[in-house]
Every structure is written in structure tokens, then in C-alpha cells.
A protein has these predicted regions:
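A helix-coil-helix interface module used to build multimeric assemblies
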Residues: 14-191, 195-199, 203-205, 209-218, ...
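Classical Sec-dependent N-terminal signal peptides that target proteins to the secretory pathway
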Residues: 2-14
Length: 295
């Protein structure tokens, strides 16, 4: 069968040779640093439109919001001095920004506002990719199911032959479960999209001025997020937990499919087969073996 799923492991390692890099790239330093700059730019632009900071300052900040101005090496060196992840980035970035404009960078915000919004954007981007992948899988499974509506095979209970079924019936359960996972992810995404945050150090908007709520709303709009929730969730991570639980359910679904395919490819059964290419190797010492993709 076709290659199924993007990897959601954020660690780069040869252990994950069967995975793709797309999602893990979202959690790598350069991507995160660019999102950090994007969030600060959205804040500055929102504040300039509301006449909280000068327009020229926001334009200068925006013009320097490029990863080439934020070397990870420079960040690491600065962090050794200031021992603060966000301040290290701000200090490095300010070196390329006009000194007067730099006074308005990160104006009124607090560290947790920025990092939590960056995390929201990372999760949003990862869900977008995963849903796209699951939709592609849905199309494939729909075709596979239609093509095998009359492909008969033994139905089994407790591993023993029971009554006849079709392979299309079996794959229809994969199709239905995949659809439910798409809907689960869309539900979680609707909550993630409302989780951008700009509420100050203790979640009360203090330090952000009289137009704090308007600033937060406009900032999130510029980041492609929905109208933010008015409650302070900095210390309440249930939406992120729901995201992780949903990923676990998606993983479990494909684990079930993988286990079924492995069992159905057993030498004694041989009801399914994967084409892995004419040069694929099943074993380094047993030439007769044709292992499933998983091992």
C-alpha cells in the first residue's frame, strides 16, 4: 500500500527513517525563529494601526523580519549572557533595526504572550499538514474500497475463520476511522485557532494600554488566527492536551491498519502484499523474506 502518514516526532534521527521531514521542520529553530518575528511584526502593525506606536517604526520592524537577521549562533551567544530565550532573540534582532524603531519592538507584550502564540502557530501549521495528508489518504482508501467490493476473503473472529467478507468491507472500516480522525483534528483546530494570546504578564491586559483587547484581536487577525478567547489560558494547557490526545488516536488508527496488513502478509496467509520496489530487501541474511514496510 502507499506510504501513509507524516511524522509528528520533532526529533531528527535515523530511527525515524520511514517518516517525512515536513512536520518536524515546523518545530526546528529557524522555523520557530521566523514565527517569533512574524508574531512581533503582527503586534507592531496592529499597534501602529491603532496609533499606539508610530507607523514608521512598525514598517522598520517589518522590513527586518527575516531569518537572515536572526542567526541561531548569535542567539546562542547572547543567551549565554542574558539567560533568557526571548530577550536573547530580541537583542540579536535589534542589531539590524533602526535604534529608534527598536524601542517599539515587543511594546507592552510579555514573553509568554509571544511564545504561546508561536506554539499556537506551530500547532496550526502541523494540523494543516496532517489534515491535507489524511484527505489524500481518504481519497486513496475510497478508491481501494470501491475496487475491492467483490474481493472475497475470510472474515475472522479471534483469529479464526468465521464468515466470508470482502476486502472492501475491511478497508471501509479504515476509511470511516480516517474520516473521524479528520473531523477530530478539525474540531481541535477550531480551538487552536482561537488560542492566540496577548494578555500581559498575569493575563489581565495590564501594560498593554486602553486598547489592549483591540490590539490582541487585530494582531491575531494578521496572523491568520480567529478572534481570540478572552480568558487567560497561559497556565491552562487543556487545548494542547486535546491536540496530543487526538494525535494519539490518529497514531493508534494507523497502528491498527499496519498490524492488520502485517498479519495478512504472513507466509501462511498471504492475502495482502505491498509492492516496495524491485530492489527492496527483506532481510540481510535470508533472501526468501519479503518483510512488510513497518520493520
Amino acid at each position: 500500500m502507499k506510504k501513509f502518514l507524516l511524522s509528528f516526532c520533532i526529533v531528527s534521527s535515523s530511527l525515524f527513517i520511514f517518516s517525512e521531514d515536513t512536520v518536524s521542520d515546523i518545530f526546528k529553530p529557524n522555523y520557530k525563529n521566523q514565527l517569533f518575528m512574524d508574531v512581533e511584526v503582527a503586534l507592531a502593525e496592529a499597534q501602529s494601526e491603532l496609533e499606539i506606536i508610530p507607523l514608521w517604526a512598525a514598517k522598520e520592524i517589518s522590513s527586518k523580519a527575516n531569518i537572515k537577521y536572526l542567526s541561531q549562533k548569535d542567539i546562542d551567544e547572547e543567551h549565554k549572557l542574558v539567560r533568557h530565550t526571548l530577550v536573547a532573540r530580541l537583542n540579536v534582532w535589534k542589531r539590524s533595526i533602526d535604534a529608534e524603531a527598536a524601542e517599539y519592538l515587543h511594546y507592552g507584550a510579555t514573553t509568554v504572550d509571544i511564545w504561546d502564540t508561536v506554539l499556537v502557530l506551530q500547532i496550526k501549521d502541523s494540523i494543516d499538514l496532517l489534515i491535507d495528508d489524511l484527505l489524500e489518504i481518504e481519497d486513496y482508501l475510497l478508491t481501494l474500497t470501491k475496487d475491492n467490493l467483490n474481493t472475497y476473503m475470510p472474515g475472522r473472529t479471534l483469529g479464526q475463520h468465521a464468515l466470508p467478507i470482502t476486502f472492501g468491507k475491511k478497508t471501509s472500516t479504515w476509511l470511516a476511522e480516517n474520516r473521524r480522525n479528520i473531523e477530530r483534528l478539525q474540531h481541535v483546530q477550531s480551538k487552536i485557532n482561537k488560542s492566540g494570546i496577548l494578555k500581559g504578564a498575569v493575563g489581565s491586559y495590564l501594560g498593554l494600554g486602553d486598547m489592549a483587547i483591540e490590539t490582541e484581536s487585530l494582531m491575531m487577525q494578521k496572523l491568520g488566527l480567529d478572534e481570540p478567547s478572552k480568558d487567560d489560558w497561559h497556565g491552562i494547557r487543556d487545548v494542547f492536551a486535546e491536540y496530543a490526545l487526538t494525535l494519539a488516536i490518529v497514531s493508534k488508527s494507523f497502528g491498527r491498519i499496519g498490524n492488520e496488513l502485517t498479519l495478512l502478509q504472513m507466509t501462511e496467509i498471504g492475502e495482502t502484499e505491498e509492492y516496495l520496489g524491485s530492489r527492496s530487501v527483506g532481510s540481510s541474511t535470508m533472501p526468501q523474506k519479503k518483510n512488510p514496510r513497518g520493520p
